[in-house]
Amino acid sequence: VTGEHGAERPGTWEYYDRRAVEGARTIGHALAYWKGLGVEATLSEIEAEAAEVRQLIRSMPPSPFVEVGAGPGTFTADLPGWGIALDQSEAALRVVRSGPDGTPVVRGDARRLPVRDRAVARVFAAHIYGLLTKEERRPFLSEARRIAEELVVVDAGRPPGVPAEHWQHRTLGGGETFSVFRRHFDAEALAAEIDGRPLFSGRFYVMVTA
């Protein structure tokens, strides 16, 4: 199976596969990320927004879903209903498999989802839409609309001074460096981009439904 967003950017997807081996990401990792971008932030501020987002996710009506870009299952257990967790990273999916909720996992490509038309009610995508280039976003959105009635996107907010999009250099524990494309969002702008409406507009997190 090809990488979730294709083999044309192996550095990005190899980074996330390798990172999954290092374990789940924490609020501490998020704080380090924002501080690395020059953002003044505290652990409690990020925790408060993350808690609001999780509560919003849990309050959604239960429904069949596909979680695209599930990673190591950061939000999988919060999703109401029943469905599958999909990611390009086998390492990440091993973490999801070992979790207590028992969500089935599928390794696959976000641009070619291995799901029949209108098979589920919801596609949930957390911190993946902001990794897609312009060329990758179009097929992802088309696939999400093909298989589901609703698309819910959770992604990174855009505090003052943070670029809307740029290439980042990420380093893992072993010292290896990767180039990763990243976008940061205003909730209203993201909603307009995917023909949706904002559910949460924070400094560090945004959540939109379409």
What do the predicted segments below correspond to?
Residues 119-121:
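N-proximal accessory regions
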